[in-house]
């Protein structure tokens, strides 16, 4: 499908052409700029720069620690072990899309994992009813937070921070600060089973990624969520049900956290009271870094998953090279700062370019 240039675009193009024809220096600068743009377009750097970074990291660590990094077992470990982080990150896309911050996601991972473990180990529930009950509970927690944010009008940061504290306390109460063991083999097989050499959680994550991609990029509700985040008042005036969308967003985030909690517990093999909180930072780092990929400027599923594995590759490579145990936290924190910084710089560059085009257009019309 071809599009016809607008009058403004035609005017800007003519002004640029006139300026270049009169000024050889401008013409050379334009040629250099065009060459750089051609390289960027060829390599798809604006959309897929993380893939090139990922390839670079793989090459660096393959040369640095060749005996351990570039092996089949290490690739399987990276892909399988990061599935839970990726699921948490996919869930965070929803609240961020509507302009909310969910600080309870990681605590919800720990709580739902412990809740499911207690039901099976202490109450004798089977795997299937436990999974169903845990998912329902997770959705109810998310919906309650959504109501407090969108209906009662309490700040999302306050609501989710309070919820995080409550859920962490509930984990301690349910577990008595002890591991909950004795989970049924049917449930444990979800975490230990493999297909094509990769753990089941990886395939669950991949399915959820596909669902998130369809929902956020190809449905009206997903587009309305992005519209709500970009301008809630404008979206509300336009008829977008922003209140319901905020409730839905936090419900989806909690549902994803519940899935992650169950899968993580199945993979560990027991209910671990310390499980969950450590996922918050890498998940947010991946979501913000993902917003600079695939669909720059929008929180999106594929960019998020790619970013999860870029960060995981860096951390795993450093650990195999003998880096200290505190490296993952530092690495993910710096990655979060870098991701937000890149997003801000891109917005400013886009605004600067738009302003420059407007100025050239105004000057051309004033000179006529």
Language-model segments: residues:
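Cytosolic-side transmembrane-helix boundaries in multi-pass membrane proteins
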Residues: 2-59, 237-244, 314-368
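Short loop segments and helix-boundary regions at transmembrane helix junctions
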Residues: 40-42, 96-101, 120-122, 126, ...
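Hydrophobic alpha-helical transmembrane segments
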Residues: 48-52, 78, 86, 107-111, ...
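Hydrophobic core segments of alpha-helical transmembrane domains in multi-pass membrane transport
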Residues: 50-63, 91-92, 164-168, 204-213, ...
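Single transmembrane alpha-helix segments in multi-pass membrane proteins
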Residues: 55-123, 147-154, 287-301, 334
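Helix-loop-helix "hairpin" substructures at the membrane interface of multi-pass membrane proteins
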Residues: 125-130, 134, 140-145, 149, ...
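Transmembrane helix-bundle core of multi-pass membrane transporters
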Residues: 152, 156-218, 245-248, 267-276, ...
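Transmembrane alpha-helical segments in multi-pass inner-membrane proteins
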Residues: 257, 267-332
């Amino acid at each position: 499908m071809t599009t016809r240039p607008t009058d403004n675009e035609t005017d800007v193009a003519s002004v640029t052409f006139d300026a270049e024809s009169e000024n050889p220096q401008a013409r050379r600068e334009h040629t250099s700029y065009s060459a750089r743009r051609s390289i960027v377009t060829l390599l798809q750097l604006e959309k897929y720069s993380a893939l090139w970074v990922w390839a670079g990291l793989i090459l660096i660590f393959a040369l640095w620690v060749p005996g351990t990094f570039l092996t089949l077992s290490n690739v399987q470990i990276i892909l399988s072990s990061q599935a839970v982080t990726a699921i948490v990150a996919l869930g965070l896309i929803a609240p961020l899309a509507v302009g909310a911050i969910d600080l309870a996601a990681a605590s919800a991972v720990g709580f739902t994992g412990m809740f499911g473990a207690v039901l099976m180990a202490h109450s004798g529930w089977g795997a299937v009813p436990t999974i169903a009950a845990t998912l329902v509970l997770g959705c109810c927690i998310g919906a309650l937070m959504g109501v407090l944010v969108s209906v009662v009008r309490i700040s999302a940061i306050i609501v989710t921070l309070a919820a995080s504290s409550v859920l962490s306390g509930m984990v301690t109460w349910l577990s008595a600060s002890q591991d909950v063991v004795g989970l049924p083999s049917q449930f444990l097989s979800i975490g230990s089973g493999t297909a094509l050499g990769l753990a089941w959680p990886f395939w669950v994550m991949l399915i959820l990624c596909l669902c998130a991609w369809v929902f956020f990029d190809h449905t009206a509700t997903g587009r309305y969520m992005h519209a709500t985040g970009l301008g809630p008042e404008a979206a509300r005036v336009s008829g977008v049900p922003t209140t319901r969308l905020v409730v839905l967003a936090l419900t989806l985030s909690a549902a994803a956290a519940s899935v992650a909690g169950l899968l993580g517990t199945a993979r560990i093999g027991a209910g671990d009271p310390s499980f969950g909180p450590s996922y918050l930072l890498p998940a947010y780092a991946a979501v913000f870094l993902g917003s600079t990929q695939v669909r720059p400027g929008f929180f999106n599923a594929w960019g998020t998953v790619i970013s999860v594995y870029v960060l995981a590759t860096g951390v795993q490579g450093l650990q195999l090279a003998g880096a200290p145990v505190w490296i993952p936290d530092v690495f993910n924190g710096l990655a979060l700062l870098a991701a937000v910084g890149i997003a801000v710089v891109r917005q400013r560059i886009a605004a600067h370019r738009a302003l420059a085009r407007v100025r050239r257009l105004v000057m051309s019309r004033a000179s006529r």
